[in-house]
Amino acid sequence: MQIWVDADACPNVIKDVLFRAADRTQTQVTLVANQTIKVPPSRFIRTLRVSSGFDVADNEIVRRVEAGDLVITADIPLAAEVIEKGGAALNPRGERYTPDTIRERLNMRDFMDTMRASGIQTGGPSALSQRDRQQFANELDKWLHQAKKP
């Protein structure tokens, strides 16, 4: 059981939460990115640099994730693939994707893509709030607690 991070788009404040959790719970955290990511020295934290390109990091995460692993990502198609493989997916705002919610999220994403393609401005997500950070930390702790149960 380990945590994979879609690190190119993951906010630094969320990475910091993950770094602390990795050491506190002795859980392996791997940040996958197409650029160099600075991480604190720890035997529980590592980086995996992939080549640049569309979905290269996502594809590497899907290739390596195993049932029971957790993936941190805001990428809904990646989260869907992780869930399909028996993993768990959590976004940086603390929303845990489930088999039931991921289908709805994929449909909404496709709808918004269609709207943007037709020229309608849809705007982006709001800035990460303190509440979002707390929600993320809470959901991460829940997952870690469940994963460590014998």
Curated annotation (Swiss-Prot):
Q: Name one Pfam family in it.
A: DUF188
Q: Which PANTHER family match?
A: UPF0178 PROTEIN YAII
Which family does the similarity line name? Belongs to the UPF0178 family.
Q: What protein am I looking at?
A: UPF0178 protein PC1_0756
Q: Which lineage do the record's taxonomy fields give for this organism?
A: Bacteria, Pseudomonadati, Pseudomonadota, Gammaproteobacteria, Enterobacterales
